[in-house]
From Swiss-Prot:
Matches recorded under PANTHER family: CYTOCHROME B
Species this chain originates from: Massoutiera mzabi
Function: Component of the ubiquinol-cytochrome c reductase complex (complex III or cytochrome b-c1 complex) that is part of the mitochondrial respiratory chain. The b-c1 complex mediates electron transfer from ubiquinol to cytochrome c. Contributes to the generation of a proton gradient across the mitochondrial membrane that is then used for ATP synthesis.
GO cellular component: mitochondrial inner membrane; respiratory chain complex III
Record's keyword annotation contains Transmembrane helix: yes
Protein encoded by which gene: MT-CYB
Descriptive protein name: Cytochrome b
Taxonomic superkingdom: Eukaryota
Gene3D superfamilies registered for this protein in UniProt: Cytochrome Bc1 Complex, Chain C
């Protein structure tokens, strides 16, 4: 078996990726989230496939087909809530994974990081289109508001929106194409994740100290496979607790009302994992300015390697940068909270201040603090 593992063309790839891979000996639990994302993706594809067997991508019957899945299909309710809450777990793991990369300077692996940012955009697009499919009130109005943002693009905006809609409003054509894209994108994400891993294993992983670990490597299996299984069990416990006890905790009650183009919900908002970006969008009174800020709030990750001014890679030995990083996390949580609040005082002002500080911390404060720390260490 050992010989087959090392000689068979396919087994050899799996062996070099998950078994005999030389890994740093000091990985912390923060390095578990990459494998957790892989498990989340597989779970989403499997549950999504079963949902697609019973779902109808038509404005007349989409809402009814989701109700039918929950009521009449064997364990349909469980598959549906595993898929909906699985997306939340996916984004929790994704945000922690990105946060780990920022904290420990993993963004200095340029190819891996850039593919990761593309993966983030693709995942966000997939999740947005999936949210439209149940065809509830929030699905319909969320799709209308978010796609309508493209009309802010000068000259081609209106034509672009109507092209995406497939008509003059969000309707049957929009739902059908969103379902088609929502079905195909996870497989594209899978391919991108393979490229992400390919680039990562080209140079070897970073580690908590941020220094070269070639002198102290251990095989991935059994050490990190066991550690990853522990992570899987913890995540499944959290996911099943959500699914079996609080299935609607992260959803919107408005989505249990069938889509009605004539009735606007009092407060249109996306899923919780987009609220931070939605808050940044809303904090700018100008439509085009808001759309630019929304895009930049994610695209800013691409520029992190260029703004790395520290002589050390990670933040493990830089207390000032650590402090600023956790302020940024608190800021993002504030933005998430604001995104779910109505547009009225004092939330407008809090949102504007949090949006401003988000960009200030990443673009100016953190690079400046890194330079200051270099001075402290006489570098």
């Amino acid at each position: 078996m050992t010989n087959l593992r090392k000689t068979h063309p396919l087994m050899k790839i799996i062996n070099h990726t998950f078994i005999d891979l030389p890994a740093p000996s000091n990985f912390s639990a923060w390095w578990n989230f990459g494998s957790l994302l892989g498990i989340c993706l597989i779970l989403q594809i499997i549950t999504g496939l079963f949902l697609a067997m019973h779902y109808t991508a038509d404005t007349e019957s989409a809402f009814s087909s989701v109700t039918h899945i929950c009521r009449d299909v064997n364990y349909g309710w469980m598959i549906r809530y595993m898929h909906a809450n699985g997306a939340s777990m996916f984004f929790i793991c994704l945000f922690i994974h990105i946060g780990r990369g920022m904290y420990y300077g993993s963004y200095l692996f340029l190819e891996t990081w850039n593919i990761g940012v593309i993966l983030l955009f693709t995942t966000m697009a997939t999740a947005f289109m999936g949210y439209v499919l149940p065809w509830g009130q929030m699905s319909f109005w969320g799709a209308t508001v978010i796609t309508n943002l493209l009309s802010a693009i000068p000259y081609i905006g209106t034509d672009l929106v109507q092209w995406i809609w497939g008509g003059f409003s969000v309707d049957k054509a929009t739902l059908t194409r969103f379902f088609a894209f929502h079905f195909i994108l996870p497989f594209i994400i899978m391919a991108l994740a393979a490229v992400h891993l390919l680039f990562l294993h080209e140079k070897g992983s970073n580690n908590p100290t941020g220094i070269d670990s070639d002198s102290d490597k251990i095989p991935f299996h059994p050490y990190y496979t066991m550690k990853d299984i522990m992570g899987f069990l913890t995540m499944f416990l959290a996911l099943l607790t959500l699914v079996l006890f609080y299935p609607d905790a992260l959803g919107d009650p408005d989505n249990y009302t069938p889509a009605n183009p004539l009735v606007t919900p009092p407060h249109i908002k996306p899923e919780w994992y987009f609220l931070f970006a939605y808050a940044i969008l809303r904090s700018i009174p100008n439509k085009l300015g808001g759309v630019v800020a929304l895009m930049l709030s994610i695209l800013i990750l691409i520029f992190l390697p260029m703004m790395h001014t520290s002589k050390q890679r990670g933040m493990m030995f830089r207390p000032l940068s650590q402090c600023m990083f956790w302020i940024l996390v608190a800021n993002l949580l504030t933005l998430t909270w604001i995104g779910g609040q109505p547009v009225e005082p004092p939330f407008i002002m809090i949102g504007q201040l949090a949006s401003l500080s988000y960009f200030l911390i990443i673009l100016i404060i953190m690079p400046s603090i890194s330079l200051l720390e270099n001075k402290f260490m006489k570098w």
